[in-house]
């Protein structure tokens, strides 16, 4: 039987799976090869070619198309991720829900750790003390490469990158006031490649207290900043959201006086992978409340 004129065959050594897919040595998965035939009447010739040169390859026949083409694809497991923004709070509130509640089991495989690598204990919401369970959605490493926007009448507008880490403090289980560690690092995206140039950083703690008389839950954030200021902020906690208001501000003795009079910091979980942060303030110059920074982070761990 003669081959179609259009089909040109060159002799070559039988390839190994690793030579076909150098990124996957040993090829621990099945390889799919599909061929579109020039002429269906010669399909048996093509099958003979496949059997000769690719004896261990699974193939599928695609009936007549105009051009001859080959393609392969690796069967890779689906990404291990949660599909509901409430997963952290659900699992923190009742860890047994991972096994006993179908909704949690099916939508929260990463938080339940039914797939992927084990989660670092600092980020494992199953280990959260009872007081912190309502803000379990905060826990994680959040990052925006270049999505931060800063604007205010007294400064030029600019864009920045920022990473926020919120983890379980080491001694949270042993203290009367369990805490989350909070760190934030912002950098100038306009600098040359290399180590990012810091423009601002913050380090502090997050705590939760329930007011029985008012039947409200309050969240506090106290921070020390790289510009020499220290702040204490408090606010009410809501479902996947908290709005802090500045209560106290201090500074080192040789730092300039703060012009901030009122400040609000809002954190809102938009979905299972995105956290929005906004900061609004009024100063001795502006006199009215205005937005100062806004950024949407992507969750990069766990």
UniProtKB/Swiss-Prot annotation:
Residues carrying sugar: 32, 39, 94, 181
Protein name in UniProt: Uncharacterized protein C28H8.5
SUPFAM superfamilies on file: Lipocalins
PANTHER family according to UniProt: MARVEL DOMAIN-CONTAINING PROTEIN-RELATED, THAP4 PROTEIN
SMART domains (UniProt xref): ShKT
Domain ShKT: residue ranges: 80-115
Entry-linked Pfam families: ShK (PF01549), THAP4_heme-bd (PF08768)
């Amino acid at each position: 039987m003669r081959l179609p004129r259009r089909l040109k065959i060159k002799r070559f050594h039988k390839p190994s799976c690793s030579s076909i897919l150098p990124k996957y040595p040993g090829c621990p998965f099945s390889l799919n090869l599909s061929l579109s035939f020039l002429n269906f009447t010669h399909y048996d010739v093509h099958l003979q070619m496949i059997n000769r040169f690719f004896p261990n390859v699974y193939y599928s026949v695609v009936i007549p198309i105009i051009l001859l083409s080959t393609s392969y694809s690796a069967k890779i497991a689906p990404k291990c991720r949660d599909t509901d923004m409430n997963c952290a709070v659900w699992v923190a509130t009742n860890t047994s829900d991972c096994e006993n509640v179908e909704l949690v089991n099916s939508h929260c495989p990463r938080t339940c750790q039914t797939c992927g690598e084990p989660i670092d204990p600092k980020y494992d919401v199953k280990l959260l003390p009872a007081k912190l369970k309502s803000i379990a959605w905060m826990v994680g490493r959040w990052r925006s490469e270049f999505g931060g926007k800063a604007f205010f009448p007294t400064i030029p507008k600019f864009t920045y990158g920022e990473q926020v880490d919120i983890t379980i403090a080491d001694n949270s289980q042993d203290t009367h006031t369990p805490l989350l560690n909070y760190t934030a690092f912002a950098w100038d995206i306009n600098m040359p490649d290399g180590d990012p140039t810091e423009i601002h950083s913050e380090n502090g703690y997050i705590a939760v207290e329930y007011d029985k008389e008012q039947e409200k839950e309050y969240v506090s954030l106290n921070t020390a900043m790289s510009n020499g200021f220290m702040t204490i902020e408090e606010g009410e906690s809501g479902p996947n959201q908290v709005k802090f208001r500045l209560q106290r501000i201090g500074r080192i003795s040789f730092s300039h006086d703060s012009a901030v009079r009122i400040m609000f910091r809002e954190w809102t979980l938009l979905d299972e992978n995105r956290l929005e942060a906004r900061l609004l303030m009024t100063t001795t110059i502006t006199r009215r409340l205005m937005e100062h920074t806004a950024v949407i982070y992507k969750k990069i761990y766990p």
